[in-house]
């Protein structure tokens, strides 16, 4: 149903759920819902982990403290196994990426009509609640990682070392500089693009499947019953998807930053 109460066609229903609440036009379009949920979940993550950290005890920990300690130890172990340099920033960065991306992905577990319906009561016509189904968000995350790759590459290797890496690899000959530069530039640029598109594609597809299943509820009793079964099955499978995508984004970030710290 639209916020105005008008019945939507299946095509209109899908389009309605895939349209962001936005202001502005063209390049200067701001997706208000994506910004709200991504920033809000980021603040929630910081508050939650800071609160648990301040209340942490050496005695018998509570369930929440145990859960968060388990996440921290898991991420710390992943960093130690993958990152071969020395940088105290990498582990906190990896933890932030993993938990933040997971929380944004987890919004996909909320039934597709609940929050848009509630927003419609307040006069908000469109609301996308999963930030990682917005290409602007995934590219922003990937761009942040890309900036860190360039920064640490120059910091560790120096400007001359970074330039040599781009121009003298894989073929160590001056005559091959144009070829090397082309190959290395494509490889470098492909890193943030693949990070962004992989996360976006998987979550967008998952959201679209939830929307298609939700359409079945408005058909007939048999399709509604089938929709319940399909939604439950996809919900269980999607828990694995959203966790795996957060893990992959984190691990690739660690790998790329580890490569940036390798001084050839």
Swiss-Prot record:
GO cellular component: plasma membrane; proton-transporting ATP synthase complex
Gene assigned in the entry: atpB
Superkingdom field: Bacteria
Function: Key component of the proton channel; it plays a direct role in the translocation of protons across the membrane.
Gene Ontology terms: biological process: proton motive force-driven plasma membrane ATP synthesis
Subcellular location: Cell inner membrane
Protein's membrane topology: Multi-pass membrane protein
Summary of subunit composition and partner proteins: F-type ATPases have 2 components, CF(1) - the catalytic core - and CF(0) - the membrane proton channel. CF(1) has five subunits: alpha(3), beta(3), gamma(1), delta(1), epsilon(1). CF(0) has three main subunits: a(1), b(2) and c(9-12). The alpha and beta chains form an alternating ring which encloses part of the gamma chain. CF(1) is attached to CF(0) by a central stalk formed by the gamma and epsilon chains, while a peripheral stalk is formed by the delta and b chains.
GO molecular function (one): proton-transporting ATP synthase activity, rotational mechanism
Disulfide bonds: none
HAMAP family, per the entry: ATP_synth_a_bact
Main location (coarse class): membrane
Transmembrane annotation, as ranges: 29-49, 90-110, 134-154, 177-197, 208-228, 235-255
UniProt-listed PANTHER family: ATP SYNTHASE SUBUNIT A, CHLOROPLASTIC (PTHR42823:SF3)
Keywords, in A-Z order: ATP synthesis, Cell inner membrane, Cell membrane, CF(0), Hydrogen ion transport, Ion transport, Membrane, Transmembrane, Transmembrane helix, Transport
Protein name per its UniProtKB record: ATP synthase subunit a
Family stated for the protein in its record: Belongs to the ATPase A chain family.
């Amino acid at each position: 149903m639209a916020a105005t109460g008008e019945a939507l066609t299946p095509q209109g229903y899908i389009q309605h759920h895939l349209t962001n609440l936005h202001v502005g036009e063209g390049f200067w379009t701001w997706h208000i819902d994506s910004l709200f949920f991504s920033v809000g979940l980021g603040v929630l993550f910081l508050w939650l982990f800071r609160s648990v950290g301040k209340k942490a005890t050496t005695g018998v920990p509570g369930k929440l403290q145990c859960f968060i300690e388990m996440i921290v130890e898991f991420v710390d172990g992943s960093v130690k196994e993958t990152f071969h340099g020395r940088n105290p920033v990498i582990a906190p960065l990896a933890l932030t990426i993993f938990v933040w991306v997971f929380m944004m992905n987890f919004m996909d577990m909320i039934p597709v009509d609940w929050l848009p319906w509630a927003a419609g009561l307040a006069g908000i016509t469109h609301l996308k609640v999963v930030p990682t189904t917005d290409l602007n968000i995934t590219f922003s995350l990937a761009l942040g990682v890309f900036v860190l790759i360039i920064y640490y590459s120059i910091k560790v290797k120096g400007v001359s070392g970074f330039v040599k890496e781009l121009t003298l690899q894989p073929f160590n000959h001056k005559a091959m500089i144009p070829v090397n530069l082309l190959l290395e530039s494509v490889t470098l640029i492909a890193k943030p693009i693949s990070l962004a598109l992989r996360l976006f594609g998987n979550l967008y597809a998952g959201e679209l499947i939830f929307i298609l299943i939700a359409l079945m509820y408005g058909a007939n009793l048999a399709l509604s019953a089938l929709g319940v079964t399909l939604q439950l099955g996809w919900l269980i499978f999607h828990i694995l998807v959203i966790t795996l995508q957060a893990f992959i984004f984190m691990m690739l970030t660690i790998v790329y930053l580890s490569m940036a710290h390798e001084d050839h």
